[in-house]
A protein has these predicted regions:
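Non-DNA-binding regulatory cores of transcription-related proteins
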Residues: 91-149
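Non-transmembrane accessory domains of multi-pass membrane transporters/channels
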Residues: 6-80, 88-89
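Pore domain of cation channels
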Residues: 1-2
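Residue-level detector of functional hotspots within protein domains
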Residues: 83, 88, 131
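Non-catalytic alpha-helical coupling and interface elements of nucleotide-dependent molecular machines
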Residues: 5, 35, 73, 107-111, ...
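Short flexible coil/turn linkers enriched for glycine and charged/polar residues
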Residues: 80-84, 96
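Short, surface-exposed, charged/polar-biased interaction segments
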Residues: 51, 71, 82, 109, ...
Length: 149
């Protein structure tokens, strides 16, 4: 029991310490796994299947699944007999999903409570980042998710 708790604590810590770059890559890997299943077998992918295919700690995958649902990229549907068993399906037509669109949706989700127009510096930073995001959105390197399948 204690070793289980220690292992779980280690996993939770790992999930918090995962780099932003790695988190983005796992987000896309999870989306690819779900879309591949959706297009191949049809229907939603059980969470345990996603974890098994990616061979990543449960906590990290769960965090990312939660983020993708919050961001409106995946929908969670009950699966199997258990209350806790959940499967995931794309929330939109996979044909229209782009790599950057998914990342941007996740980055934007959450409660915005800060007014970024309060200082000149924040206003300038906001404008620069919006320009950069627009460039990424329009870039030919912003491939459709299905092009990575």
């Amino acid at each position: 029991r204690d070793s289980q708790n220690i292992a779980r604590f280690g996993e939770e810590r790992e999930s918090l310490l995962i780099s932003y770059d790695q988190r983005r890559k796992i987000l896309l890997a999870v989306m690819l796994t779900v879309v591949r299943h959706f297009r191949g077998q049809g229907g939603a992918t059980p969470a345990d299947e996603i974890r098994a295919q990616l061979d990543l700690p449960t906590r990290i995958v769960n965090d990312i699944l939660y983020q993708l649902v919050q961001a409106g990229q995946l929908i969670a549907v009950p699966s199997g007999d258990g209350e806790r068993e959940v499967a995931f399906a794309p929330a939109h037509d996979p044909q229209s999903m782009t790599v950057y669109g998914i990342l941007e949706a996740v980055e934007k989700s959450g409660q915005t409570t800060v007014d970024l127009t309060q200082s000149d510096e924040l206003t300038r930073i906001d404008q620069e980042l919006e320009t950069l995001k627009e460039t990424a959105r329009k870039s030919q390197d912003n491939v459709r998710l299905v092009d990575l399948l």
